[in-house]
UniProtKB/Swiss-Prot annotation:
Gene: TMSB10
Modified residues annotated as Phosphoserine in this record: S12
Listed name of the protein: Thymosin beta-10
Native source species: Bos taurus
Record key words, sorted: Acetylation, Actin-binding, Cytoplasm, Cytoskeleton, Phosphoprotein
Pfam families xrefs: Thymosin
Family under the similarity heading: Belongs to the thymosin beta family.
PANTHER family: THYMOSIN BETA, THYMOSIN BETA-10
Amino acid sequence: MADKPDLGEINSFDKAKLKKTETQEKNTLPTKETIEQEKQAK
């Protein structure tokens, strides 16, 4: 168990190996208008 992190491994990390991913908003919070409409519907 190493107490100190191995910085050599971090410095030699190849960022090109990382895959580019498209970030997609999945759970967007409803607007105040949407919340009010839902309250009115009940």
